[in-house]
């Protein structure tokens, strides 16, 4: 019965692992709902900022802010939003693959790339594959605040202000639903014109009080910050959804493995009983 004992031990081990993955699935489901609430709460502000900025990009401005002007592209920057923890399926690696493809496209044109990392998984990945990481922040937890994210954002905006960057993108996962999270690369600077057909058909003229430069300086920075924060909370909701799905798959796979091991155990036990009966019958016949 040595084989049967070993199989029983494996079954017990898988059952213990199954309890852990089930608990992690339930925790991820709870955190996902909270993340979705935060995402829904911040989305109206981010969407409204995007519309206001879209009006500005299509407008006839008396003061042309540097964030609204296209430049010859020599260096681009990416604000990369990844997770701090693993066990969330291919969420991070799919994002990194898309980013690497975009970086290669720029590199083929002779354009250099800078990276500002949000999340430890991005830091560790680009430490191994290589990349010019100029800023990073990790360990933000499940309820990040804008003050925790502002470091990398300031670094990239300063580089853009000083002419060391000519384009700035945010790279994150867009939350569609529990089963779908899409890696996206969105241009932040220079400010892209709105894709809204209604805005394209209109000409917008603005009067600024008291000073257009001061107003636009503040407004455009708030726009970048709002888009980065929205990207982070959507990525967090995507992380919890991906982890919940991964842990459910692990729990289900554990159940299938237990059934297979139970079948092997039953066969081994049956073979052992048959062997014992054969030995008893053989001994009786000898007597």
Curated annotation (Swiss-Prot):
It is a peripheral membrane protein. It holds the Pfam family ATP-synt. It comes from the Bacteria. One of its GO terms (cellular component) is proton-transporting ATP synthase complex. Keywords: ATP synthesis, Cell inner membrane, Cell membrane, CF(1), Hydrogen ion transport, Ion transport, Membrane, Transport. Its main location: membrane. One of its GO terms (biological process) is proton motive force-driven plasma membrane ATP synthesis. GO terms for molecular function: ATP binding; proton-transporting ATP synthase activity, rotational mechanism. It is found in: Cell inner membrane. Disulfide bonds: none annotated. Coiled coil: none annotated. PROSITE patterns: ATPASE_GAMMA. The keyword Cell membrane applies. NCBIfam families: ATPsyn_F1gamma, PRK05621.1-1. Belongs to the ATPase gamma chain family. PANTHER family: ATP SYNTHASE GAMMA CHAIN (PTHR11693), ATP SYNTHASE SUBUNIT GAMMA, MITOCHONDRIAL (PTHR11693:SF22). Produces ATP from ADP in the presence of a proton gradient across the membrane. The gamma chain is believed to be important in regulating ATPase activity and the flow of protons through the CF(0) complex. F-type ATPases have 2 components, CF(1) - the catalytic core - and CF(0) - the membrane proton channel. CF(1) has five subunits: alpha(3), beta(3), gamma(1), delta(1), epsilon(1). CF(0) has three main subunits: a, b and c. This is ATP synthase gamma chain. It comes from Citrobacter koseri (strain ATCC BAA-895 / CDC 4225-83 / SGSC4696). The lineage of its organism: Bacteria, Pseudomonadati, Pseudomonadota, Gammaproteobacteria, Enterobacterales.
